[in-house]
Amino acid sequence: AAIVKLGGDDGSLAFVPNNITVGAGESIEFINNAGFPHNIVFDEDAVPAGVDADAISAEDYLNSKGQTVVRKLTTPGTYGVYCDPHSGAGMKMTITVQ
């Protein structure tokens, strides 16, 4: 499984790493690393055709350190992801599914 931290160890508002490649159906575990409220929103304009961005997003906030969300993406392509409250600060990432 791939692991993505929400918030850097240094307190930065970032997905760490901010670019990953996974196999179709591989688990991606998002972990709140900072204790700030973060969420995982798939950009409806930046997912493969036919993918329901709302269905794979986790819009409810992960409020506490250590909270996790797991997603499995089965459609190959590139996915743009952002944290809604912190996207203005550049908290975005790209997931490539092969």
UniProtKB/Swiss-Prot annotation:
Major site of localization recorded for this protein: plastid
Family the entry assigns: Belongs to the plastocyanin family.
NCBIfam families: cyanin_plasto
Protein's name according to its UniProt entry: Plastocyanin
GO cellular component: chloroplast thylakoid lumen; chloroplast thylakoid membrane
Localisation: Plastid, Chloroplast thylakoid membrane
UniProt topology in membrane: Peripheral membrane protein
Binding site for Cu cation: 38, 83, 86, 91
Keyword Signal: no
Organism taxonomic ancestry: Eukaryota, Viridiplantae, Chlorophyta, Ulvophyceae, OUU clade
Biological role stated in the UniProt entry: Participates in electron transfer between P700 and the cytochrome b6-f complex in photosystem I.
Gene name as annotated: PETE
Keywords: Chloroplast, Copper, Electron transport, Membrane, Metal-binding, Plastid, Thylakoid, Transport
The Plastocyanin-like domain, residue ranges: 1-98
GO-annotated molecular function: copper ion binding; electron transporter, transferring electrons from cytochrome b6/f complex of photosystem II activity
Cofactor requirements of the protein: Cu(2+)
